[in-house]
């Protein structure tokens, strides 16, 4: 068969999957009558009445409740246009299998019938003209006959219950757009589940009860919604015609929807109040193929919520519960919408449905109020509803045995899901807070505080004392320093005195020539005696005078820029003596190289050994220095001194180590880096000449006309 026909027929299969045997027999009889041409008028009248004026189910239920009691039995007409469409698809399949060449004509007829452009009689007449009477009769005889299903709406007022076919539900679904249909999901591979959906009532309280199989009650805690019917198709009263929700694919990444496999039709009862006037009864269809999708999306298409009235009821605690069901008594109270959004967790439901964030496997009955409170505190049961008729003053949900919600609960469903936080009750305004609750005590006295402070300071000092850890006793060190102080001072003072005395005895001028000069001056001037201090004083004066002269000469030599030029410009072309000296020096160097090779090897060996020993000694010295530095740092930290000086020292040493090559060149480079002005200029070698001496002597008033200045002039002239 072609894929396009298969897709078309699969779309129509969503309308119905199984029907009763009576419906099939009636449809076959009507088809045979249409083919034979008998009783066409009667069939037209019946089908026209059913297709044009379908009576909605909720109107029938209201009529039943208004006449006698709300529990009167009422059957529903089984014939439906959707049933005919479903059977027509089966008929067209078999016809196309017999005659594949007439596929396009069959498709056109099917579209016209689906759009209600053709009636059933016209469709059958055109199909009979297209294919033939014999083929249509053989196809109708080959149509599969189905067993009667277990689905139906039952009323507990009588012993026998009528079986209502699926066609009646589809008529109600098509005729009344305000009804809410919840179709249970059933997998095609594992088969269908036959379960009975009954509308029951209690004798004391006229309430509606819906029995659902345990497999259809599922909790979705991630998406934040209670999904009692996984994969349902819901129509809301906001649409003018039959409003369908869009198909949702079963996505595991967005939400985790688990469908429990059920061996038998286990039941769970949900007690509800009577539906208000603006609401319509909810139908639960049997196991059929439905669309997948979260139930939490249906309020988008509706103008009011599905359950606007709070669930109430008065059921006694002696009510028996089956082994695969659990009884949870819940009293719902109104919670503000904003308060719910601010304080409720994500898995709570805001549409008035009890939310139990648990996977349901086995059942645990909970009958009493106290047991339920304990159980709910362990497993994190939260309930919330919205009320359309009354407003409760309290803002918290409470648990009561008046309302009973039966749902399958597992025996393993008491894990540690939610952490229940209990806020401590605050005392009243006039009540005094005990000291134990506040965790405080009376403040101690000042003396005790001082004692504790001193003891803590001592302990901290002992703990922070680095010298104690290193094994140094400061008190003993102080005693040793005090004891050895005066002795050391005496020794130092004696040595210092000796050095000063030796330096004082040393003079710039020698004694013998100075004494000769002094005797000559004494003879000329007529002096007889001179003290020894005069000689020392004269030598010191000469020294100071020479220091001043040299300082001035050096300063002037730095200021001088002109270079000395010889008066007689002579160019030396050849110097024979210099060439002979260079040749002799080369010969000596070659001879020294030959004879000094062996001596150098010996010296190298000795130098290597010396270098090794020096390196070992240097390493030891470095280690000793580092230990001493660490000890000094520890002592300074213990005493409380500042350690910046030692840090600067270490930084300077590190710079010296990183500098390339020790020596004068490195010092010059470091000096050049310090002064940016002279960094790029090469250093000029300075020298002192006679001109500098003359310039200094001429500026002095005492020496400007002295004989020394004339002598210097004469030397310059003689040298030139």
Curated annotation (Swiss-Prot):
Residues 186-198 have a biased composition (Low complexity). It comes from the Eukaryota. TAFs are components of the transcription factor IID (TFIID) complex that is essential for mediating regulation of RNA polymerase transcription. It is found in: Nucleus. The keyword Nucleus applies. This is Transcription initiation factor TFIID subunit 4. CDD domains: HFD_TAF4. Residues 149-203, 427-456, 589-628, 654-678 are annotated as: Disordered. The keyword Transcription applies. InterPro entries: Histone-fold, RST, TAF4, TAF4_C. Component of the TFIID complex. TFIID is composed of TATA binding protein (TBP) and a number of TBP-associated factors (TAFs) whose MWs range from 14-217 kDa. Interacts with TAF5, TAF10, TAF12, TAF12B, TAF15 and TAF15B. Expressed in roots, leaves and inflorescences. Belongs to the TAF4 family. Residues 79-149 form the RST domain. GO terms for biological process: DNA-templated transcription initiation; transcription by RNA polymerase II. GO terms for cellular component: plasmodesma; transcription factor TFIID complex. Pfam families: RST, TAF4. One of its GO terms (molecular function) is protein heterodimerization activity. Keywords: Activator, Nucleus, Transcription, Transcription regulation.
């Amino acid at each position: 068969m072609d894929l396009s026909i298969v897709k078309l027929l699969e779309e129509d299969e969503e309308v119905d999957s199984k029907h009763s045997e009576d419906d099939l027999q009636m449809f076959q009889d009507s088809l045979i009558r249409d083919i034979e041409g008998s009783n066409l008028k009667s069939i037209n009248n019946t089908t026209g009445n059913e297709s044009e004026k379908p009576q909605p189910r909720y109107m029938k239920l209201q009529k039943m409740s208004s006449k006698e009691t709300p529990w009167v039995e009422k059957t529903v007409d089984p014939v439906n246009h959707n049933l005919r469409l479903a059977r027509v698809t089966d008929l067209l399949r078999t016809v196309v299998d017999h005659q594949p060449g007439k596929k396009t004509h069959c498709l056109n007829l099917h579209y016209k019938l689906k759009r209600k452009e053709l009636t059933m009689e016209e469709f059958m007449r055109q199909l009979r003209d297209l294919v033939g009477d014999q083929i249509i009769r053989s196809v109708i005889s080959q149509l599969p006959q189905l067993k009667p299903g277990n689905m139906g709406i039952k009323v507990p007022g009588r012993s026998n219950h009528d079986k209502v076919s699926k066609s009646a539900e589809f008529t109600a679904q098509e005729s009344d757009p305000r009804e809410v249909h919840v179709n249970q999901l059933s997998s095609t591979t594992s088969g269908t589940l036959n379960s009975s959906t009954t509308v029951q009532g209690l004798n004391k309280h006229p309430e509606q009860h819906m029995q659902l199989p345990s497999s259809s009650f599922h909790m979705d805690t991630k998406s934040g919604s209670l999904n009692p019917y996984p994969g349902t198709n819901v129509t809301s009263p906001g649409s003018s015609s039959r409003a369908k929700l869009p198909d949702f694919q079963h996505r595991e990444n967005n939400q985790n929807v688990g469908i429990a496999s059920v061996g038998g039709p286990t039941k769970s009862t949900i007690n509800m109040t009577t539906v208000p006037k603006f609401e319509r009864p909810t139908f639960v269809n049997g196991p059929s193929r439905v669309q997948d999708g979260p139930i939490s999306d249906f309020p988008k298409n509706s103008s009011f919520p599905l359950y606007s009235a709070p669930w109430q009821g008065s059921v006694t605690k002696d009510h028996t519960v089956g082994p695969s069901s659990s009884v949870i008594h819940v009293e719902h109270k109104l919670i503000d919408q904003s308060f719910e959004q601010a304080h409720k967790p994500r898995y709570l439901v805001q549409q008035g449905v009890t939310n139990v964030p648990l996977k349901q496997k086995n059942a645990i009955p909970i009958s009493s109020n106290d047991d339920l409170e304990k159980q709910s505190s362990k497993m994190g049961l939260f309930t919330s509803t919205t009320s359309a008729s009354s407003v409760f003053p309290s803002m918290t949900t409470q648990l009561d045995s008046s309302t009973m919600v039966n749902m399958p609960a597992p025996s393993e469903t008491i894990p540690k899901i939610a952490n229940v936080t209990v806020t401590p009750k605050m005392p009243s305004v006039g009540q005094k807070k005990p000291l134990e609750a506040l965790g405080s005590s009376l403040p101690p006295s000042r003396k005790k505080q001082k004692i504790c402070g001193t003891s803590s300071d001592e302990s901290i000092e002992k703990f922070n004392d680095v010298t104690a850890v290193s094994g140094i006793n400061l008190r003993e060190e102080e005693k040793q320093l005090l004891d050895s102080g005066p002795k050391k001072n005496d020794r130092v003072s004696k040595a210092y005195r000796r050095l000063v005395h030796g330096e004082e005895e040393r003079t710039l001028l020698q004694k013998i020539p100075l004494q000769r000069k002094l005797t000559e001056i004494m003879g000329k001037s007529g002096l007889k005696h001179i003290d020894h201090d005069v000689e020392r004083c004269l030598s010191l004066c000469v020294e100071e005078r020479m220091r001043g002269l040299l300082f001035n000469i050096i300063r002037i030599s730095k200021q001088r820029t002109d270079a000395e030029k010889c008066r007689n410009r002579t160019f030396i072309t050849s110097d024979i003596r210099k060439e002979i000296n260079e040749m002799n020096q080369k010969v000596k160097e070659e001879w020294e190289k030959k004879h000094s090779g062996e001596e150098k090897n010996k010296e190298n060996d000795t130098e290597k050994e010396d270098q090794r020993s020096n390196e070992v000694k240097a390493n030891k010295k470095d280690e000793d220095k580092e230990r001493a530095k660490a000890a000094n740092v520890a002592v300074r930290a213990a005493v409380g001194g500042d350690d910046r000086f030692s840090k600067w020292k270490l930084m300077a040493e590190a710079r010296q180590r990183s500098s390339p090559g020790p020596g004068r060149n490195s010092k010059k480079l470091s000096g050049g880096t310090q002064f940016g002005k002279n960094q790029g200029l090469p250093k000029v070698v300075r020298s002192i000449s006679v001109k500098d001496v003359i310039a200094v002597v001429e500026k002095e008033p005492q020496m400007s006309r002295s004989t020394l200045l004339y002598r210097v002039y004469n030397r310059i002239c003689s040298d030139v």
